Amino acid sequence: QKCCTGKKGSCSGRACKNLRCCA
């Protein structure tokens, strides 16, 4: 699943919390 949305890399979903794009 794609957790990164937009150029800012906003996070959607709890599992995406640990991804770098969500930082």
Curated annotation (Swiss-Prot):
GO MF annotation: an example: sodium channel regulator activity
Tissue: Expressed by the venom duct.
Pyrrolidone carboxylic acid modification, residue list: 1
Localization per record: Secreted
Residues bearing PTM Alanine amide: 23
An annotated GO cellular component: extracellular region
Record's keyword terms, sorted: Amidation, Disulfide bond, Ion channel impairing toxin, Neurotoxin, Pyrrolidone carboxylic acid, Secreted, Toxin, Voltage-gated sodium channel impairing toxin
Entry keyword annotation includes Secreted: yes
Domain notes: The cysteine framework is III (CC-C-C-CC).
Function: Mu-conotoxins block voltage-gated sodium channels (Nav).
Family to which this protein belongs: Belongs to the conotoxin M superfamily.
Full protein name: Mu-conotoxin-like SxIIIB
Organism of origin: Conus striolatus (Cone snail)
